Amino acid sequence: MARRIICAKLGIEADGLDAPPFPGPQGQRIFEHVSKEAWQDWLKLQTMLINEHRLTPFEASARKFLEQEREKFLFGGGTSTPQGYVPPRS
């Protein structure tokens, strides 16, 4: 049976993650308060941010930027898309 949580992002009861996404207090907070659906939404946005901003994830400044955006997306009011971003056509 899936673990159910009240998702901080979606504001609904939903399936929780199977394990913390990474070690430490931030990973534990996400594990306890973010649903699988919201985490998948974040991963899609993170990929877009990496591509649009041409980030190199192993650089400290890029990791810090992604950490701030993740916090805003999951627990704050959301993030904005990069300036000039045009979504792909279906």
UniProtKB/Swiss-Prot annotation:
Pfam families: Iron_traffic
One example GO MF annotation: iron ion binding
Protein's GO biological process: cellular response to oxidative stress
Keywords, sorted A to Z: Iron
Cross-referenced Gene3D superfamilies: Fe(II) trafficking protein YggX
InterPro entries assigned: Fe_traffick_prot_YggX, Fe_traffick_prot_YggX_sf
Keyword Transit peptide on entry: no
This protein's GO CC annotations: cytosol
Task performed by this protein: Could be a mediator in iron transactions between iron acquisition and iron-requiring processes, such as synthesis and/or repair of Fe-S clusters in biosynthetic enzymes.
Similarity field: Belongs to the Fe(2+)-trafficking protein family.
Protein name, UniProt field: Probable Fe(2+)-trafficking protein
Organism name: Methylococcus capsulatus (strain ATCC 33009 / NCIMB 11132 / Bath)
